[in-house]
Curated annotation (Swiss-Prot):
Family: Belongs to the LysR transcriptional regulatory family.
One annotated GO molecular function: DNA binding
Amino acids binding toluene-4-sulfonate: 98, 100
Task performed by this protein: Regulates expression of the tsaMBCD1 operon and of tsaT in response to p-toluenesulfonate (TSA). Acts by binding directly to the promoter region. Binding to the tsa promoter depends on TSA concentration.
A GO term from the CC aspect: cytosol
Ranges annotated as spanning the membrane: none
Protein name in UniProt: HTH-type transcriptional regulator TsaR
HTH lysR-type domain span: 1-58
Species per Swiss-Prot/TrEMBL record: Comamonas testosteroni (Pseudomonas testosteroni)
């Protein structure tokens, strides 16, 4: 089983075509097909099936792909770690970040990291727990920065707390309940449920339950934090969002934070990674910069 063949299989799965994968890998299509055939012979199972739209993974291929990605990732990380320990600070870091930290500590952390390690390539993706779990497991992500509840985190993941996110209730500036001080005053309002580790609207639903109130009235579900401020600014909906998102969005002048005296659940932001898959020295350095700036801005 050759590493290059596993890389080729991953490429085929990503582009969905033998021809396109062969071009990207600078191989002839017959040579690529022969390599995949040899891998299938070794595994004694078909990995790919041809369709009208190209090629796709069989059930065997889907099962094997998780292992292929992990093998390729661990091989790359091992090479990068040895190189970094020898003083050659190159390589790649891929991680996911939730909106709260992406707007606050992350820009400063990335700038500091780039000054220290200018030759390390960083790839940042949007992502929240638990959606990021499969990519953490197969090694696609080195780590994730996301809100989570400690008891909900899978046991194969290591969770290192960064800070507690400050959550606020937000509505358009002229909202009738703009000056409300108690959750009970918001019972008749409609809500835009945003994504959360325990499902859309979990924060406000938990808050209502804590104070013995009925379920909040659902107006819509908005899983895009980028769209959420604009949706609320042009409607009568209320929503919850991290204070950093409320204070740093294009619709800030059209929004208000409801001055509640009742406490809201404030989720913890964690660094999540596989506990049995150590990060490279460069990734550890980036995490240290994130921790440093999170303490200042969280």
């Amino acid at each position: 089983m050759k590493l290059q063949t596993l890389q080729a299989l991953i490429c085929i799965e990503e582009v969905g075509s033998l021809r396109a994968a062969a071009q990207l890998l600078h191989l002839s299509q017959p040579a690529l097909s022969a390599a995949i055939q040899q891998l299938e012979d070794e595994l004694k199972a078909p990995l790919l099936v041809r369709t009208k739209r190209g090629v796709s993974l069989t059930s065997f291929g889907q099962a094997f792909m998780k292992h292929a990605r992990l093998i390729v990732t661990e091989s790359r990380r091992a090479q990068e770690e040895i190189g970094q320990l020898r003083g050659r600070w190159e390589g790649h870091i891929t991680f996911a970040a939730s909106p709260a930290i992406a707007l606050a500590a992350l820009p400063l952390a990335l700038a500091s990291f780039a000054r220290e390690f200018p030759d390390v390539t960083v790839n940042v993706r949007d992502g929240m727990y638990p959606a990021v779990s499969p990519q953490l497991r197969d090694g696609t992500l080195d780590f994730a920065l996301t809100a989570a509840h400690k008891h909900d985190i899978d046991t194969d993941l290591e969770a290192q707390p960064l800070y507690v996110s400050d959550v606020v209730i937000v509505g358009q500036r002229q909202h009738p309940m703009a000056n409300a001080t108690r959750l009970a005053e918001l019972q008749e309002c409609r809500w835009a449920f945003s994504s959360a580790p325990r499902g859309p609207g979990a924060i406000i639903r938990n808050a209502f339950a804590r104070y013995g109130l009925p379920e909040p009235k659902l107006g819509l579900v908005c899983e895009s934090f980028l769209a959420l401020p604009g949706v609320v600014a042009h409607s009568d909906l209320l929503t919850t969002m991290p204070r950093t998102l409320y204070e740093r969005n294009a619709f800030k002048d059209q929004l208000c934070s409801i001055p509640l005296q009742d406490a809201l659940p404030n989720p913890t932001i964690y660094v999540l990674r596989r506990h049995d898959l150590p990060v490279t020295p460069a990734a550890a350095g980036l995490i240290r910069w994130i921790q440093h700036h999170a303490l200042q801005t969280g």
